[in-house]
Every structure is written in structure tokens, then in C-alpha cells.
Amino acid sequence: LGYLGTCPTNIGTGLR
């Protein structure tokens, strides 16, 4: 879901 920096623009929870 983009929590561990996997998706910076997924849900706003990624760290790129």
C-alpha cells in the first residue's frame, strides 16, 4: 500500500 517506501504517491504513506 506504500508504507515502507514502496509507493511514494500511492496513498501518501510511502517514503520513496
Swiss-Prot record:
Broad enzyme group: transferase
UniProt keyword list: ATP-binding, Kinase, Nucleotide-binding, Transferase
Superkingdom classification of source: Eukaryota
Keyword Nucleotidyltransferase included in the entry's annotation: no
InterPro entries to which the protein is assigned, alphabetical: ATP-guanido_PTrfase_AS, ATP-guanido_PTrfase_cat, Gln_synth/guanido_kin_cat_dom
EC number(s) stated in the UniProt entry for this protein: 2.7.3.4
Family listed: Belongs to the ATP:guanido phosphotransferase family.
Name this polypeptide is given: Taurocyamine kinase
Organism listed in the record: Arenicola marina (Lugworm)
